[in-house]
Amino acid sequence: MSEPLPPPMPHARIAIIDLGIGNINSVEKALKSLGAEVFVQQDYALLNDATHYILPGVGSFAAASQAMVARGGAAALNNLVGDKPLLGICVGMQLFARSGAEHGVNPGLGWVGGEVGLLPVPLPLPHVGWNDITPVNDCPLFFNMPAQPCFYFTHSFAFTQVPVQQAAAYCTYGHSFVAAVQAGRRYAVQFHPEKSQQLGLLLLRNFLQFG
């Protein structure tokens, strides 16, 4: 894809949904570096006027799930986001699943078919560092990127199964796993774009184009 990179979406107002489970400063800083208006809030009632949503997560699926349930679960988040674009990052991606098996089985949002489990690999865990991914299904997050862009990962758990049509990228660490998903206007990545230098910023900038 060689088209000129579009400018950031005008008047984008980005809400970072704070589940209280990890440091989100790097996500906020990366978005602000792109010229976006960014605010962070735990109370869904104060997030209604956003144009885009970010669901970050650092830590365990169990803690993220419990924090989400305490805020009304999938129904409350569906009501908040509606048809606006949303990007899940790391554990935020894992929450798209039906359930996760970290520290017991806990419910996810059910936006993507499949569950989250420990990576079944003969390699050290967590999977930490830079790795190439292979985008599929023409996911617009990867507009204007190389065929196999490289991003920064740090995780031990991942989707164990994803319907082919909802997969947006794959990565290999001992074996192939889903590194990004798409469900309508809701997107998610297992890696950390905010820590992935220029390609990470490009991914976030692409997300800001979704009006």
Q: Over which residues does each language-model region extend?
A:
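Amide-donor transfer/coupling interface in amidating biosynthetic enzymes
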Residues: E3-P7, E115-G211
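Extreme N-terminal starter segment of soluble prokaryotic enzymes
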Residues: M9-A15
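Conserved beta-strand elements of the Class I
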Residues: A15-I17, Y152
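Short acidic low-complexity segments
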Residues: V38-D49
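Short acidic/histidine-rich motifs immediately flanking catalytic phosphotransfer sites
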Residues: L47-G57
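Cysteine-nucleophile active-site neighborhood
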Residues: G59-W130
